């Protein structure tokens, strides 16, 4: 079931060169360890560049957004079977 969330979250990420790689995030008091990054893409909205990550743990899929202008992470969607 797909659930639109659109909530700010805290993310632990690795930064290598010009690339951010989310490792885990905190949502609703739970720490979710990212097991796989399924898809990444970026787009500009005005002068801000947004990075999107489709990630999964062992059971769920999530869509994360990173705003490079204000360094804010957002959980956009969650999907669970």
Predicted regions and their residues:
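Cysteine-centric segments in proteins
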Residues: 1-81
